[in-house]
């Protein structure tokens, strides 16, 4: 286990299994994104809320010639992921380490893929709709918005009321923001919460196998 994690009670193989996922199933997941053919090998990608970097590193493996950006406001995540990038000598990941209320760091129609993985629940709902609007602005025509639909009983509607969302409701909502559903991938996305949340870590013996695996939802900008 990486000593920088400062975690106990996780299974000794967990972080080796995560590193393997980043090089295999995770890489394959992102290689299956419905990207335009001319950018397939070298897309410009944003992972909003990159956390501890699992998806960032898998994206880097899937698109070694791409430009991978990550946004996160957590100092703990910023430190750990930054150190891993340096230690691994990765050149195609750029971190944007700050709290944001829009995607102003990116120009209109400048991105080929945006990930909103475990990023749309909680709060008052305004953040979710901001991300819908801003994703549509920064994505190129025909580019992909990929969502990992977790915590669906803790999403908010336009009035800020907690609602239980379904895939059908997510599709309908994204259609209002100019996106059409483009299917899922053979590989499932991983919900990393149990790896990094003290509540679960205290329970002990966290293994890769018990992490929630979810079908991602891919949308294309109309």
Regions found by a protein language model. Name each.
Residues 112-126:
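A short SAM/SAH-binding and catalytic strip from SAM-dependent methyltransferases
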Residues 101-114:
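A short acidic, Gly/Pro-enriched loop at the edge of an enzyme's catalytic core
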Residues 129-141:
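A short glycine-rich, Lys/Arg-flanked "PGG" loop and its adjoining helix->strand segment in the class I
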Residues 52-64:
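Conserved SAM-binding loop of SAM-dependent methyltransferases across substrates and taxa
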Residues 23-42:
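Conserved alpha-helix/loop element of class I SAM-dependent methyltransferases that forms part
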């Amino acid at each position: 286990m990486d000593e920088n994690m400062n975690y106990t009670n996780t299974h000794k193989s967990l972080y080796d299994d995560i590193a393997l996922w980043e090089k295999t199933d995770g890489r394959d997941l992102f290689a299956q994104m419905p990207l335009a053919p001319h950018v397939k090998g070298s897309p410009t990608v944003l992972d909003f809320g990159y956390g501890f970097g699992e998806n960032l590193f898998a994206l880097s493996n899937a698109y070694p010639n791409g430009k991978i950006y990550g946004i996160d406001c957590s100092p703990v995540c910023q430190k750990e992921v930054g150190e891993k990038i340096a230690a691994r000598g990765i050149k195609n990941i750029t971190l944007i380490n700050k709290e944001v209320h829009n995607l102003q760091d990116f120009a209109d129609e400048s991105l080929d893929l945006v990930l909103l993985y475990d990023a749309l629940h909680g709060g008052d709902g305004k953040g979710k709709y901001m991300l819908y609007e801003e994703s549509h602005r920064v994505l190129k025509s025909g580019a992909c918005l990929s969502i990992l639909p977790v915590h669906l009983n803790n999403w908010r509607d336009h009035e800020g009321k907690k609602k239980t969302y379904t895939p059908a409701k997510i599709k309908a909502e994204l259609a209002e923001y100019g996106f059409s559903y483009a299917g899922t991938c053979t590989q499932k996305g991983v919900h990393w919460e149990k790896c990094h949340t003290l509540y679960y870590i205290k329970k002990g013996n966290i293994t890769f196998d018990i992490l929630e695996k979810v079908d991602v939802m891919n949308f294309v900008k109309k």
